[in-house]
């Protein structure tokens, strides 16, 4: 990676906002960008975790709930008053439950659409004017990066609510890329498969740690948050004319959304 460099005519400090920064992939993205020379503002609901991250890596933070329009407006006002903005990395999202379609709870589906689709629209609408202001002032290009999921691409039993929400977010990203065509704004989607983080599966399964652990039983090297963060950093630090429209990434053990090898990965004998 080329720290702090795009097609800006040299090295300069760029500033990014990372949502969902209090844990998991969002936290890993903050760490990766700080390591490559970015100024970073981490955004999440849990202020105490953001403050601990700031102390560890030198990021800044802003506590906000992206489901609240007033919080998003306050974030945009803070960012506008405190400097240029070159990138939005939207990680915040989540899944709730594994119900079949016929058993799905409306409140769970509504929550998933709120945190995955509407929050993405809300934060994009609020910060796109700031990204445009930066590039209009000679800031080269701007970036928007969205962490979706392979669940947006392939349905699976018990995943309908999350499948639908992530597919909605993915289509939002595709539409945005078309809408900003002709502007120096990159729109990147990163769609991870199985990622082992401290909270995602646990939250989805209602805090059942045993059930969460079973999901990963026997899987040799599922992705971890830092793997996704590395891809985000690569996309941001690529030359400014290069847009990675969609990066789908899975662990080697997961060939498709519904095909997962459990146990050691063993090469076939050449004679087989």
Residues covered by each model-derived region:
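Conserved glycine-rich Rossmann-like NAD(P)H-binding loop of the short-chain dehydrogenase/reductase
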Residues: 36-51
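Residue(s) in the substrate-gating loop at a strand-loop-helix junction
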Residues: 149
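Active-site helix of classical SDR
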Residues: 124, 165-168
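Conserved glycine-rich cofactor-binding loop
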Residues: 22-23
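Substrate-binding pocket helix/loop in short-chain dehydrogenase/reductase
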Residues: 99-101, 105-111
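C-terminal helical subdomain
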Residues: 189-190, 209-258, 262
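Active-site-adjacent segment of SDR/Rossmann-fold oxidoreductases
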Residues: 154, 175-185
């Amino acid at each position: 990676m080329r720290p702090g460099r795009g097609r800006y005519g040299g090295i300069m400090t760029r500033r990014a906002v990372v949502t969902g920064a209090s844990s998991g992939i969002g936290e890993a993205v903050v760490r990766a960008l700080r390591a490559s020379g970015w100024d970073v503002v981490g955004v999440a609901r849990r202020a105490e975790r953001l403050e601990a991250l700031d102390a560890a890596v030198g990021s800044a933070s802003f506590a906000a709930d992206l489901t609240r329009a007033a919080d998003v407006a306050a974030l945009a006002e803070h960012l506008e008053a405190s400097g240029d903005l070159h990138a939005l990395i939207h990680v915040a999202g989540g899944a709730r439950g594994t119900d079949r379609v016929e058993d799905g709870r409306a409140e769970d589906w509504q929550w998933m659409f709120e945190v995955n689709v509407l929050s993405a629209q809300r934060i994009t609408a609020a910060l796109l004017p700031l990204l445009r202001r930066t590039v209009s002032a000679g800031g080269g290009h701007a970036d928007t990066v969205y962490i979706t999921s392979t669940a947006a691409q392939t349905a699976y039993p018990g995943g309908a609510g999350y499948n639908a929400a992530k597919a909605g977010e993915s289509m939002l990203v595709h539409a945005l890329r078309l809408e900003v065509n002709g502007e120096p704004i990159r729109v990147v989607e990163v769609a991870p498969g199985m990622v082992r983080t401290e909270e995602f599966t646990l939250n989805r399964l209602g805090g059942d740690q045993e059930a969460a652990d079973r999901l990963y039983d026997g899987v040799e090297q599922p992705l971890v948050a830092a793997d996704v963060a590395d891809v985000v950093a690569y996309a941001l630090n690529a030359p400014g004319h290069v847009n990675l429209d969609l990066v789908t990434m899975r662990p080697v053990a997961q060939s498709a959304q519904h095909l997962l090898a459990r146990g050691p990965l063993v090469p076939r004998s050449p004679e087989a």
